[in-house]
Design a protein with these regions (language model features):
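Bacterial carbohydrate/catabolite-sensing allosteric modules
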Residues: 1-317
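Catalytic core regions of nucleotide second-messenger enzymes
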Residues: 266-271, 503, 550-553, 580-600, ...
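Short regulatory/linker helices and ligand/cofactor-binding micro-motifs at input modules
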Residues: 306-338
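Signal-transducing coiled-coil linker helices
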Residues: 311-315, 335, 426-478, 486-497, ...
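Helix-loop-beta substructure at the N-terminus of cytosolic sensory domains
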Residues: 325-369
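A short, aliphatic-rich beta-strand micro-motif
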Residues: 403-420
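Conserved long alpha-helical elements within nucleotide-processing catalytic cores of c-di-GMP signaling
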Residues: 484-508, 515-542, 550-554, 558-559, ...
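Catalytic-core segments of nucleotide cyclases and related cyclic-nucleotide turnover enzymes
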Residues: 526, 569-577, 588-591, 603-637
Length: 637
């Protein structure tokens, strides 16, 4: 049976993660390991609810059921998230390999950020004679950003260059913040530093674009360097001078560490993999031939990708629609299964959507009462397939992650993310992937669009529930809480259809009128009169427990009797009259409002003489007035 390895990472760092997993994929022994990659897409631009919901993906796995854990530190920008992950890993009691984050008891594999950044800065100072340096940093708490900062400081000090806090801006890894800072801080190109040193390639590319859009500068007019050696940095013009962190080699080292552990041996506790400075056009060097080759390769790939882009978009749109158009939880499940189990697909051979049981209760509970940031132990398998074989299980335990998984065959990589509306967790989904495809946006696109569809679905469901409640209130008598005249008119139309189709062959109508309501109101007040009506209604409802009761007038009620109430109608009506007599005989035990007097009349449907239900109602009404007249003669109170 294959080993299960949990990989905890941030989805926005997909390219570095992809390179790392490519090293793992290449060097893992065949049919030896499956990798469950739990991806959070939390960023500094998210509100707190969304950040916490994204981070909950690391709580989905029961880590002690895995054989090892890999914490992919780059991109884990929130210290509280890092602390939580490390705590969960410690509690699991299994081997932990930490990439880029040192922690007691964990095997550490790191990229030598310092060495690569030092090479880059030395190059800018020595070859390009840069003396005024500016660092667009990540976040203050991020180790990688701070190690790169130390390399800049050390290089500046060695060359006698002033570099202080005013030469650092913390972007929180957000390009927008970097752009705003540069626009407000530098009024003209004359104020620019000799080089913008950026904590990653994305910040570097954004800075380069800003130079052209805002300051109308050509690439040769400003020097910009990045870090990471992302695909975009190679094909961008100018290609970025940057640092390759050699994540492929780090992935290879991680596999070597795992193999050593599983062989019962002790691997090295700490390994540093050298980074590599990569010269590009953005620093002023001439390497256009290599960059042009990269761009041609990219263009060819884009032409191929564009052929499938509309197909993928159409598939995701269909999935969105399947969720949004569902008017109930069961309808959504059916819609998704119909879509996913039929026809061709763009989501790959392995794909699962799991629903949290809370989705069944969305319409039943008020929104404030729904559990927040909460995971269930069991999840419903809405749709699932592994290697194009449909899942047969309806539920999956969280400890298994994937249902019906024999854990045999080729090594697999599963990408896993939460589905949520703000801090309401709706479930999780899984997409099988190759290491190379992790850098593509398919997984994040599916996740974003499903989350968005859930927003519309849940809001629609809540609105439908609210409308139903309002409709129910419109059909409910406010005093007695039985159905009112509006509901009665609606009900008898539907009931008449059942009679016509033969679905309802036997029934009776019981008509009731409360006696002496005016006497109670005049003698004891209207509050007592209201209580008198409620007590009368309760006696009717308690008598005919299995039949609908309607208040059709101020002191008039009607019930349509069928099934057991129809069969036992005479005995039930007699018991109601007996109860009224018992209360009258024991006046000292009851309040005046409880000693009720109700005239009643009953009529049974006769298909030979009754053309419709109103004919039966009218007969019951006549019988009721006949009894009312008799009761008045008998001086009922």
């Amino acid at each position: 049976m294959k080993k299960r390895i949990a990989v905890l990472a941030n989805g926005w760092n997909s390219e570095n993660l992809s390179n790392f997993m490519m090293g793992i994929e290449k060097y893992a022994k065949p049919e030896s390991m499956d990798f469950y990659v739990f991806l959070s897409f939390a960023s500094y631009g998210y509100n707190e609810s969304n950040r916490k919901a994204e981070a909950l993906v690391y709580e989905i796995p029961e880590l002690n059921t895995f054989d090892a854990i890999i914490i992919f530190g780059p991109g884990l920008n929130f210290q509280e998230v890092i602390d939580r992950i490390q705590k969960l890993a410690d509690e699991a009691g299994i081997p932990v390999i930490s990439i880029g984050l040192k922690h007691p008891g964990h095997y550490f594999i790191g990229a030598d950020n310092y060495f690569g950044m030092k090479q880059l800065v030395d190059h800018m100072i020595n070859k390009h004679e840069c003396r005024k340096l500016m660092y667009i940093a990540g976040s203050r708490e991020n180790d990688d950003s701070n190690i790169r900062l130390k390399a800049i400081r050390d290089s500046a000090e060695e060359h006698g260059i002033d570099f202080g806090e005013d030469d650092i801006f913390y972007s929180e890894w957000e390009a927008r913040r970097a752009m705003e800072y540069i626009r407000t801080h530098f009024k003209s190109p004359e104020d620019f530093p000799d080089v913008f040193l950026c904590a990653n390639d994305q910040l570097a590319i954004t800075t380069s674009q800003l130079m052209e859009m805002t300051y109308h500068l050509e690439p040769k007019d400003v020097k910009i360097c990045g870090f990471d050696h992302l695909d975009a940095s190679r094909i961008y013009y100018p290609s970025m001078s940057t640092v390759d962190q050699e994540y492929y080699s780090i992935g290879k080292t991680a596999i070597e560490t795992l193999d050593t552990i599983f062989e019962g041996k002790k691997p090295e506790v700490e390994v540093m993999v050298p980074c590599k400075f990569v010269v590009g056009e953005s620093c002023g060097c001439n390497c256009g031939r290599r960059a042009m080759k990269e761009r041609k390769t990219y263009i060819r790939k884009q032409q191929v990708d564009n052929r499938f882009a509309s197909f993928k978009e159409g598939r995701i749109f269909e999935l969105e629609r399947a969720i949004i158009q569902g008017q109930s939880y069961d309808a959504v499940k059916k819609n998704i299964r119909t879509l996913m189990n039929g026809g061709t697909s763009s989501e790959g051979n392995t794909f699962y959507i799991m629903f949290d049981p809370i989705l069944e209760k969305i319409g039943e509970k008020e929104e404030p009462l729904l559990p927040r940031l909460s995971l269930d132990q069991e999840y419903f398998v809405v749709c699932g397939k592994k290697n194009n074989v449909p899942s047969i299980s309806e539920k999956v335990n969280r400890s298994d992650i994937i249902p019906d998984d024999p854990r045999t065959g080729p090594n697999s990589i599963y990408l896993i993310g939460t589905l949520h509306l703000e801090d309401l967790i709706c479930g999780y989904f899984i997409m099988g992937s190759t290491a190379k495809n992790i850098r593509e946006s398919d997984f994040s696109n599916y996740k974003t669009r499903i989350d968005r569809a859930f927003f519309t679905y849940i809001k629609n469901l809540q609105l439908n529930t609210l409308n139903k409640k309002l409709a129910d209130l419109m059909e409910q008598d406010s005093l007695t809480h039985v159905k009112n005249r509006t509901a009665y008119d609606k009900y008898i139309k539907a009931f008449q259809k059942l009679v016509k189709t033969g679905e309802r062959k036997e029934y009776a109508v019981a008509y009731f009128d409360i006696n002496d309501l005016k006497v109670i109101n005049d003698k004891y007040g209207h509050e007592a009169g209201d209580a008198y009506i409620r007590n009368s209604c309760k006696l009717i409802c308690d008598t005919f427990k299995h039949s609908p009761v309607f208040r059709i007038g101020g002191d008039e009620f009607l019930s349509i009797l069928y099934n057991d109430d129809f069969k036992n109608r005479e005995e039930l009506l007699a018991s109601m009259k007996e109860e009224m007599e018992n209360r009258k005989a024991s006046r000292d035990k009851y309040s005046p409002a409880a000693i009720v007097s109700i005239a009643s009349g009953m009529a049974v449907f006769d298909p030979e003489t009754d053309p419709d239900i109103m004919s039966v109602v009218n007969k019951a009404d006549v019988h009721m007035y006949e009894e009312k007249a008799r009761m008045k003669k008998g001086n009922i109170r």
